[in-house]
Amino acid sequence: SRSQLLLVTDELWSHPRSVYTDIPETSNYLDHLGLLAKSLPSTIQQSLELRRHLGQRVVGHPVESWWLNQLPTIDMGDSSIPFSKIVKNAKLVIVAHNGTTIPENFSRGIPTLITWTSNWVEIRDEAKPIFAKLAEVGIFHEDPVSLAKHISAIWDNVDAWWESKEVVEARELFCSQYAKSVPRPRKFLRQIIVGKLTMGQQGDL
């Protein structure tokens, strides 16, 4: 049975590249996630598994010792297991970065929460109403303590919350912009490549 609370983290850069939205090691990223973890009830903390970004050792310092100091019981995860398999076995996924995991999980119906602050992720103006809706139904949280409270509230029946009318509507709103499925994807891609459609029509965070 699915029992894990999976926390998917981003890489932290010792020397962030100015032309990208790299998160620097000097940011409050780890403090934010540490507060989230420590604000969870102990029973849920024991279910917490970390999925660290595979590029962390290349672009910055290892984070294992930091996490184990914060929460000695945390499961540091096994990077040799494919991410798709780990996600499938999770009861609930927390995504702490703006990446493909969010639209992929939404389109596959995997219960997923999002947390970040404007310090690390800047939401484009056209996406703000969508994220406001995600926040309204409890999917998106900028405050780690409110996220921990929400997880505690839904933990005993995650699926009931995830399949509730308002949450389904918010997910569909997001997917209509950022995870749209098309009946003939190869033809659709070919049309984009030859310029008959623009990627802007598909939405972009």
Where are these regions (language model features)?
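Catalytic binding pocket for nucleotide-activated donors in carbohydrate/polymer assembly enzymes
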Residues: L68, L92, H97-Y178
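Conserved phosphate-coordination/catalytic loops
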Residues: I23-D31, G77, A179, P183
